Amino acid sequence: MQWKLRKRKGVTAMEEITASEVRARLAAGERAGRSFTLLDVREPDEVAADAIEGSQRIPLGEVVSRMGELDPARVTIVHCAAGIRSKRAIKALRRAGFTGELVNLTGGMKAWHKSAPAAPPASSPPPRDRS
């Protein structure tokens, strides 16, 4: 499956991917940590409350000092709550010399939850036998 990336226009172009596209890759059998890395840059209390399975967790404030934990041979999809800290993390990693491909998850966890498949309707109990 090819990456569907968008480059945003601006001072610094940044590759982005939607939550739906990440979900599609996971549904197609790709696993976070094998063909790509999901990097969660939120704070530990945020991650404890809610996380994407398989994400590597490095808070924004530690991302540069811990960039050696990231595999530059794999695409790294960076996410946070809404997409702001992940953009900061990408910029910081680039400035620090990280050579791998960095992609921002557009909208972060908010978009992740909005992209979740709708829950199936609750089934009705079987009709009572009134005989």
Question: Which role fits each region the language model picked out?
Answer:
Residues M1-T37, V41-I77, I84-S131:
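Rhodanese-like catalytic fold shared by cysteine-dependent sulfurtransferases
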